[in-house]
Design a protein with these regions (language model features):
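Transport-system extracytoplasmic interface segments
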Residues: 1-72
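Membrane-interfacial helix-loop-helix connectors in multipass membrane proteins
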Residues: 48, 126-152, 227-228
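A hydrophobic alpha-helix feature that marks transmembrane segments and, especially
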Residues: 64-89, 169, 173
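Junction motif at the cytosolic side of a transmembrane helix
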Residues: 80-84, 170-176, 225, 242-265
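Hydrophobic alpha-helical transmembrane segments that constitute the membrane-spanning cores
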Residues: 105-134, 163-164, 168
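Hydrophobic alpha-helical transmembrane segments of polytopic membrane proteins
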Residues: 144-175, 196, 240-249
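Transmembrane helix segments
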Residues: 175-211
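Short hydrophobic, aromatic-rich alpha-helical segments embedded in or entering the lipid bilayer
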Residues: 203-227, 235
């Protein structure tokens, strides 16, 4: 009752103020409406508030999918490398009939598997959530998913796991202890948050943007599910990820040849 009375008195106060302005031959709109708000997408086209909210929520959802890969990969890499270095068990493992490259490749692929599982679980939950919301909220009534978009989305999630797992392995390999590895992995976690802040900025997405790891994954996933994607940008994202992943694997093999990296304590 109190809130209702306060709202009524506030409206009545505004009404009396407008009457005084009109009596003085002053248009109230010229006094109170000093600026207008227009919401536009990254292409500069005006969009409705509901469309903006849906795009923002989807951007945050896909960012969390990439973050899931990062968290899983960093934790796995920390356990597989930093913890074993701290406990001195890598020397024991290398007494087995395997090369250093085989050992590192196995740990890297384990990171990829864990990252892929985490991302696909998040991906499925996101799609299911939006599908359910479509039947419950007017805000999502225009949301639709094609089979092609789902397939490409799965491909992007798996490819992102290859790249992010490689970066996580490289970052944590320099650490001597579990705590150092966790601290180093936080850098990668912070990078994955960038797409959320980028969604608030007004800028034009160019072709170069799809060569930037992490940022391109969130963008291409968002475009896939808003129906605004181009196959050229999709191919650039896939191609650049493959190239980056190969370079990271090559650098890992070269880096882990050093005994200081393998057995630092």
């Amino acid at each position: 009752v109190t809130s209702f009375a306060s709202a009524y008195l506030d409206d009545y106060n505004t009404y009396l103020g407008n009457l005084k302005l009109i009596d003085s031959n002053i248009d109230p709109e010229e006094i109170f409406d000093n600026f207008t708000i227009e919401i536009k997408d990254v292409s500069g086209e005006e969009m409705s508030t509901s469309a903006f909210l849906v795009e923002l929520i989807m951007s945050i959802s896909f960012t969390y999918i990439i973050m899931a890969i990062t968290l899983a990969a960093v934790n796995m890499a920390t356990s597989a490398i930093a913890v074993e270095k701290e406990h001195g068990t890598l020397e024991t493992i290398l007494t087995l009939p395997m090369t250093t490259n085989e050992l590192i490749m196995g740990k890297y692929l384990a990171n990829v598997v864990i990252g892929s599982i985490a991302s696909l679980i998040g991906f499925v939950l996101t799609i299911v959530s939006f599908s359910i919301s479509k039947n419950m909220f007017i805000l999502y009534e225009d949301f639709s998913i094609s089979f092609v978009a789902i397939v490409w989305g799965v491909v992007i999630c798996i490819l992102a796991s290859f790249l992010i797992s490689g970066v996580a392995t490289l970052i944590t390999s320099s650490a001597k202890t579990y705590k150092e590895a966790q601290a180093a992995g936080q850098i990668l976690n912070y990078v994955c948050i960038l797409p959320i802040f980028m969604s608030y900025l007004e800028f034009t997405v160019t072709t170069t943007y799809y060569f930037i790891p992490v940022l391109n994954y969130t963008t291409i996933l968002l475009e896939l599910y808003t129906g605004n994607f181009e196959y050229m940008n999709l191919l650039i994202t896939i191609g650049s990820t493959i190239v980056y992943s190969v370079l990271i694997i090559w650098f890992m093999f070269k880096r882990f040849k050093s005994e200081k990296v393998l057995f630092s304590s």
